[in-house]
């Protein structure tokens, strides 16, 4: 079996976007929470609290419901505001150390992104760091219906479809910083198996962003404690194929 593609999460995996996402979230919530500055949800009071809430909930909809107190109808409206507010905020997130080196060293393999951020915002960041040509498919939250967000595998399937690769006797690698990313990858593997494909999905946890995969109920296949660990893991997988 060969590695046909490497799929990535974006926030907390390719880039450290926490500070930008906090500010964008505040702007979005001002449409729903009167006097937000005096009624700031705990999750937005610090980077640490934001990351704690982000890892606690399965996806952005749960985050907005339980951490910010929005109704389902308000969450739908907030979803429509995320892309324009992200694009309006010109702040560029920092790419994790040596990530451009890692991506360029794996450029012989097709790359895609499955994210709950907006695809245009992701592309703009990749272009700034001059690695946009390495990514052949970018699926953002707006490319998938609200009922099919992670860990539903729909975004994974759509991303792979755009990559136009062979699925049979193939290995797909998925890299993410959240337990739900691992579940997301395994859900996609189960779908491919149900369709008769001999497709193996290897899930790598991006622990360099600060999460603790040892505490996860659903464990990744590998853990990257630094970005360059990803290269070592890919080489290990290739040697076993």
Predicted regions located by residue number:
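N-terminal helical cap/lid subdomain that shapes the substrate entry/recognition surface
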Residues: 3-97, 101
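Conserved Rossmann-like nucleotide-cofactor binding loop
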Residues: 13, 20, 119, 180, ...
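Short beta->alpha linker loops
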Residues: 20, 94-98, 117, 151, ...
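Phosphate- and divalent-cation-binding pockets in alpha/beta enzyme and binding domains
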Residues: 24, 98, 121-124, 184, ...
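Substrate-recognition element of Asp-dependent hydrolases with the DxDx(T/V) motif
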Residues: 25, 102-127, 141
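Structural recognition of alpha->loop->beta junctions
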Residues: 131-142, 213-235
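Acidic, Mg2+-coordinating phosphoryl-transfer loop and its flanking beta/alpha structural elements
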Residues: 174-225
